[in-house]
Amino acid sequence: MPPSKAEKRGLTLEKLASYDDVITDALVDKIYYWATIRKNRGTRFTASRGLQEEDIAGVIREQVIWDKDPVEAVQQLLDLPGLRKYMKGLRDEKDQDQFKRHLRRYVNIYMPDCPFEVTTTNRYTITDHEASITARRDINPREEIKYLTGVQVAMTEEQEKTLELARKDFSLVISSRKKTRSLFLGPARFANHDCDANARLSTKGYDGMQIVAVKPINEGDEITVSYGDDYFGDNNEECLCHTCEDRQQNGWAPMKRVEDSDDEDMEEAESPVENPSEATSSGTATSGGKRARDITEEDAGADLPPTSKRARIEKKPSPTKARASDHLREATLKKVHSTSSLRREMPVSSIEDPSANINVTSPQMTQDIRNQQRDGLLTVSLDETSSSRESTPQSPLMAASPKSSHSTDATSVDDEHHVDSLPKIKVEPEVVHENPALGVATVKEEVITTTVNAPWPSPPAEDDEMSDLSELSDSMEFDSVKQQIVKRKFRPTLRTTRSKSRYEVHNRVGTPVSSAVGQDGEWVENPRKPGDYMTSSSLLSAKFSKWVECQTCDVQFVQQDGYNTRKECPRCERHSKLYGYAWPKTEREGKHDKEERITDHRIVHRFVDPDEERELKRGKTKKILKESIRERFSTPRSGRESMSASVEVDSGRKRRRVRKTM
């Protein structure tokens, strides 16, 4: 009899994600864990109410730690109400076997010979604790870290969106052999990234994963692997690992680049559709906009030589392109009007030939034209057929001039004036030339020829180099409400650099502070500082939260609701509840070891003695602890300040002052 389709099916993505969520909730979150493991299905996962903390911890303690029988532990765990109900939902026998194998991977991490322990770290989000792996003993290079394994399943982008893994991609790996993206789950997924990792991921079998040490790992060190060169942005520029913190690079760099947002796309998305029928006939706005952006990016990526002649338009533009050009002309006219008539008052005589000595306009006529221009009586007429992409070659000096980006208003006189007998002036606004070498996309030039009916006769216009344009001073501006020129108001600007006297000393240690502005964005101060996950005041936001030093591992931690001070950190306290020994001990170390295992964790007093508690409340120990944390996680800025202070002590001025007092 041929096998059915159900028997042919293997481990799928949805099944593995569901198995891992249920097992991590049962065997990690509900065993004295002080945080919550991030689930693969996000908000769609609901914890089982049939799993109690003491029931699961009792099975792990008796069957795994004391008797070292993980097989019996798996069977007893499946007899608990929550897991028994979940197993009944798996009707296929093969699915039940896969769930048992995945459950066994998590049961093994509580074996006494397991060299690691699942802990947490707040390095990445400061206020939220995420899972991590800490070594419980010394690990040699090229040693397979026992029980730190996982399983992978190939996936597609559609499945990734279905499981809402876009923001939870820390369990996604790309196989260098198969060149496919896979979902990687199991105890090994708790290993975080480091640019100088002490371990690596390797395949084992068909779909298995194993972590192997590449460097000596000491007891208490975090076990890390490398996720890739571009996992956290380009060249891992957003990485917050321990190595980047020591080197003050990537996510820990003193200065951070600000990426420019696409304001035009946002305005286009927010603007309503004027003609729904046209939008429907031409396709959806999203798809059309995406195609347009793709074409733009493709054109911008090509290396275009500086063109001296503009390409002629030989084909009639399509309706879509015509609408785009209409929006472009509206934006151009708005920009021209805002940058010429209001900001820069230009006398009429400035566009005339100075050498011609022709005085055909009186001051009264000039004033009338300006008043009509400001009151909106002068209208703009565009000739659709006169649009051209042809222009004369421009000199590099004119292209680089900042004045070339501004142009005069294209205006025409209303019906009160005789426009038939008046000459016509063609005004071609200048186009800003971008330097392709500065990383800016080269845009093809496009000029819209505008016909201006001037109310006065004028000789033929000459080159721009011969015209003398007068403009307002930088300290003056035109007030559109009062219709007069007023003094420009001071607008404070954000400082992106430090003063010279400060950063010269600061550059002696650490990464130099750049005072330049990047070509594709500004540099601002990075909000993340080295050690801020230990020194941040947001950690003590609760009323009775405080810093406490663990009496077992000498690590500082924040105790929430610290009415009474605890002796141990959450990691050491969880370890002692399970194994009955102080961290990192899991069993007797030989026949000469006479220390008894504590089988009932409830008999252990978890808080400090009353005398020590009184000392802590006086504030002396608390102040010393804060100073030690500040010195341990001091930023390079504080180190530089201490260096500058030491230089001042050794200076001659200081020595002379000492000699005078003596």
Swiss-Prot record:
Biased segments, Acidic residues type: 260-271
Signal peptide: none
InterPro entries in the record: Hist-Lys_N-MTase_N, Set9_fungi, SET_dom, SET_dom_sf, Suv4-20/Set9
Basic residues composition bias: residue spans: 653-662
Stretches the record annotates as Disordered: 252-418, 627-662
Comp. bias intervals (Basic and acidic residues): 323-333, 627-640
Protein's recorded name: Histone-lysine N-methyltransferase SET9
Organism: Phaeosphaeria nodorum (strain SN15 / ATCC MYA-4574 / FGSC 10173)
